[in-house]
Every structure is written in C-alpha cells, then in structure tokens.
Amino acid sequence: MLTLARQQQRQNIRWLLCLSVLMLLALLLSLCAGELWILPGDWFSPRGELFVWQIRLPRTLAVLLVGAALAISGAVMQALFENPLAEPGLLGVSNGAGVGLIAAVLLGQGQLPNWALGLCAIAGALIITLILLRFARRHLSTSRLLLAGVALGIICSALMTWAIYFSTSVDLRQLMYWMMGGFGGVDWRQSWLMLALIPVLLWICCQSRPMNMLALGEISARQLGLPLWFWRNVLVAATGWMVGVSVALAGAIGFIGLVIPHILRLCGLTDHRVLLPGCALAGASALLLADIVARLALAAAELPIGVVTATLGAPVFIWLLLKAGR
C-alpha cells in the first residue's frame, strides 16, 4: 500500500514537472512569435525591448494568468456543483461578467475608468454563480442544472446582443469583438488586473483539503465536518472574482475550464493537491498555444482567441458528453 502511494506521488510529481516545462516552452514561444519573429538572443536589442518587453510580455503574462484562472475555476465549479460538465463559459458565468461590463459602459456612458469596468464584470460573474448555486441547493439533477446554466448563458448573451445592436456607442461596437475573446489590447496598463488574479489563484491552489471533501459529495463532506455553507460561499466568491477579472482582461473564452480538468483527471490527477496546480499549469499552456495560433493564423489580422479555443474545445466537449452517456 505504501509502495503504491509512493508510486502515485512520484507520478504526480512527474506530471507537474512535465506541465511546468510545457508552460515554460509555451511562454518562450509566445515571446518569440509574431509577425516579426524575435529570438531570445535579440530580446535586449532596441527592437526586442519594444516588441518583447513592452508589447508581448504583458500580453503573455495576461494569457498565462487567465488560462490558469479559467482552468482552476472549472475544477472548482465541477466540485462545487458535483457536475463533471460545469465550467464558467458553459454555465453562463463568463456571459454574466460580460453583461456586467456592458451595463457599466451603458450606464457610465463610456466615462467609467477601467477599474470600475473590471469591478462590474466581477459583480456580473458573481451574480450568475450565486444563481447557479441556488439551483444546485434545490437538488436538481445534473442534466437540469446544466440546462439551467445554459439557459442563463443564453439570456446573458441575448442581453449583450441587444445592447450592442441598438447602441450607437463606439465602445459597445468594439466590445462585440472583445466579447469573442482576445488579448490584442492588453499592455502594462492592465497590470492591476493581472495582480488581482495572483493572490486568489495561489489561495485556491492551497485549498486542496476542502476541495477533496467537496468532490466526495455534500453528504460525505458534511459527515467529515466540512462547514459547507462557508466553503460554498467562499469558493463561489473566489470563482466569480477570477472569471470576472479574466473577462475584464480578455473577454469571454470558453472550454478551457471544461476540457483541462477533464484531461488531467483522465491522466490520473484526481487528488486536488495535484489537480489544482496541474490545472493552473495546463490551462496557462493551452491558452498560450491558442493565443499563438490566433496571432499567426492570419497574416493581416488576428483571430479572436475565443474562436480558437471553441474550435479546439468543442470536439473534446462532444466526446466527453458521449462518454458520459455510455
């Protein structure tokens, strides 16, 4: 038994090391890649200081943090709702953040500062997450809870479309592209949003014990002495914060929170002591690679990263649905 535990521990360490190496390689490639490729040897040249340190580095850090936040949010929501298909985009949390953002632009007539827009996006994400948690407490079946989340997402998407379609505001027209997901406008001015993600990410990665209890189910967690009300509300707040900040940084990006935790579980990373940091590393790597594809796919323009993640993630999602139905 002890030998099996040690083997599992070594395997977990190997997975985390491999994911760390993958993330570092993706980070280096992201700094090099672009319309003008700049190799590491030229990073400290005048051209490198402009393109790498002023343009690509803040974007790369934002992609890394958002990818980690979305993947961890997916893992947390799947444990919270006891639903393997739960994730921020599918359950409408990302769209809720978008509604909060667009409402702020409308009510503020485009005059609100960036920090206020970010807070409104966080508030929108929190509201949708709390509604979903209310549904979960009514002991809805997995399929009904999933449908409730999809319905909330459709309502939020419709509200955003109505607001954008009837608005004459240039800001809202630009938001229509932005809500498809993209890091094109990220620079060092958004560093406060990046910093707002770091403490919550680190804190959640350290909460493996309550997360493991929640993953056992509500009854088992209560029998083990976990204060469910406290942890549910704290994790809802943390998830809403991460999703809201991510939407404020890059718009709505789907499937990262769904696919990454599932793939890691299939690889044997079921313990949240390993799953949470693994999700952070794998989510960051996946979104970095998707961002590179979005930048390089077209010569004269940049694809919305949400399109890239949806194209890659939708087939995996269909496969997971088919597997769950067997």
UniProtKB/Swiss-Prot annotation:
GO molecular function list: vitamin transmembrane transporter activity
InterPro entries, alphabetized: ABC_BtuC-like, ABC_transptr_BtuC, ABC_transptr_permease_BtuC
Q: How does it sit in the membrane?
A: Multi-pass membrane protein
A GO BP term here is: cobalamin transport
The domain of life is Bacteria
What are the GO cellular component annotations?
plasma membrane
Report the transmembrane regions from the record. 19-39, 61-81, 88-108, 112-132, 146-166, 184-204, 240-260, 274-294, 302-322
Which keywords describe this protein according to UniProt?
Cell inner membrane, Cell membrane, Membrane, Transmembrane, Transmembrane helix, Transport
**What is the purpose of this protein?**
Part of the ABC transporter complex BtuCDF involved in vitamin B12 import. Involved in the translocation of the substrate across the membrane.
The record's similarity note reads: Belongs to the binding-protein-dependent transport system permease family. FecCD subfamily.
Q: How does it assemble?
A: The complex is composed of two ATP-binding proteins (BtuD), two transmembrane proteins (BtuC) and a solute-binding protein (BtuF).
For this entry, the protein name equals Vitamin B12 import system permease protein BtuC
Task: Tell me the gene name.
Answer: btuC
